[in-house]
Amino acid sequence: MQTALYISVLIISSCGLVYELLAGTIASYLLGETVTQFSLIIGTYLFSMGVGSWLSKYLEKDLIPKFLEIELAIGLVGGFSSAILYLSFGQIRYFQIPLFLLVILIGILVGLEIPVLLRILKKELQFKELVSRVLSLDYVGALLASILFPIFFAPKLGLMRTGFIFGILNVGVALWGTWVLPLRQSKIIILRAQSVVVLTLLILGFSYSDLITYYSEESLYTDEIILSKQTQYQRIIVTRWKNEIRLFLNGHLQFSSRDEYRYHETLVHPALLAHPTPKKVLVLGGGDGLAVREILKHKNVESVTLVDLDSAITNLFSEHGILKKLNEESLKNSKVTVINTDAFLWLEESDQIFDVVLIDFPDPSNFSLGKLYTTAFFHTLKRRMNETSVLEIQSTSPLFARSSYWCIERTIASLGFYTLPLHVYVPSFGEWGFVLAGQRPIQFKKDFPKDLKFLNIQELESIQTFPQDMSRVPVEINRLDNQALVRYYDREWNRILD
């Protein structure tokens, strides 16, 4: 019996942590503010475990069948938690209600497990030996789950299937327990019947995960979903309405094919026109290849290095028929080298010097993205530039996130760069901002590529003029130790979205 229960501890601790990770990941995907979501969920989950541990004192008789019933309950609720959350988001206005109800319920049930196990085993071992073994196995199981969740389960199986898999593991513990633990025959029959019912539901859920995911995402997106993919880093959704293609990453719109040219022409061409002879170009982010498409319109460019973290994005936009048509197969051009790694780390290790650097990172909605807009990042980037090099970075909206925009501009300027703020109206986004910078005052050539849809000499002058409601405001410099930009961004966009 001891061995069976020790193995159970290893499994159930893994399951408990995975349910917590699933809730935090889904909440951060759907609501943003990763740090806030994980902090609230972890705190609520741990508090609920404490409540469960306290409630365990009221379980006095038949502890072994009660332990197995707890496992069945956790398997059922935890296994379906991802599906419930995805389906709730599109149907319930206050998504936080089902989110925290599930976290509290799972936390209480998980909190019951270890105290009940300790009481079952108390006659088998000395107390100090019992506690050390059970708790050490509990922590080992949590470690295994924390390693395998981001590396294997989330990217390979997706969040919904991962939930069902661990629910099945919980039920497996209960079913196995009916064979290896001492139970009355009547209890064995009841528990096995319950286990089979719950197991069947979880297997059906696992089998229909794609259908559940499709239905839940259909309720979130008004247009037809033509591609849905979970990667190690993000959820990719591509939608289509007539001839319009839209890309969403973690629920956030990245571009619409109807007007993306306004964004990408403004991101790329001012920088290349600000350099006398741009030959080597570095693109950080921009795995969709749309910025690279614009770069290749400058015939004097000899090489383009694209560094994007997620290989799934660059592969999709290299191979998918509709998507590679959008970027005119730019990622397959012989001038282009694609590198899939962390941009910050790559810059630290590289010794190359570039004429133009274009930065198309996601908005600084969390601290892991916010670090890419800090003085530390731009200082590292500056080592990959010479006195004639220029950089341009997308800088969120100067209208909706005014302090965020000027925080990025001031951070770059604090490192000795001459900066030129730019903005453009993109119908699918609204007013959007960029910062162009170099170690010399910015001066433009006038030899525009011929096939641009939006940018010309007149528009280049126009996008440099900021109206009063987007003009400069006093802001902090964004550093690694203060992450002021993330605070500005959260405050401003939450105000708009509420």
Curated annotation (Swiss-Prot):
Return the GO cellular component terms, semicolon-separated: plasma membrane
Keywords attached to this Swiss-Prot or TrEMBL record, sorted alphabetically, are: Cell membrane, Membrane, Polyamine biosynthesis, Spermidine biosynthesis, Transferase, Transmembrane, Transmembrane helix
- PROSITE patterns assigned to the protein according to its UniProt record, in alphabetical order: PABS_1, PABS_2
**Region span, Spermidine synthase:** 196-446
Q: Does the UniProt entry include the keyword Kinase?
A: no
Annotated positions binding spermidine: H264, D288
Q: What is the annotated localization of this protein?
A: Cell membrane
Residues recorded as binding S-methyl-5'-thioadenosine, renumbered to this chain, are Q234, D308, D342, A343
Recorded hits in Pfam families, A to Z, give: Spermine_synth
Annotated transmembrane regions: 7-27, 35-55, 67-87, 97-117, 134-154, 163-183
Catalytic activity reads: S-adenosyl 3-(methylsulfanyl)propylamine + putrescine = S-methyl-5'-thioadenosine + spermidine + H(+)
InterPro entries annotated for this entry?
A: PABS, PABS_CS, SAM-dependent_MTases_sf, Spermi_synthase
> What exactly does this protein do?
Catalyzes the irreversible transfer of a propylamine group from the amino donor S-adenosylmethioninamine (decarboxy-AdoMet) to putrescine (1,4-diaminobutane) to yield spermidine.
Protein's name in the database: Polyamine aminopropyltransferase
Provenance organism: Leptospira interrogans serogroup Icterohaemorrhagiae serovar copenhageni (strain Fiocruz L1-130)
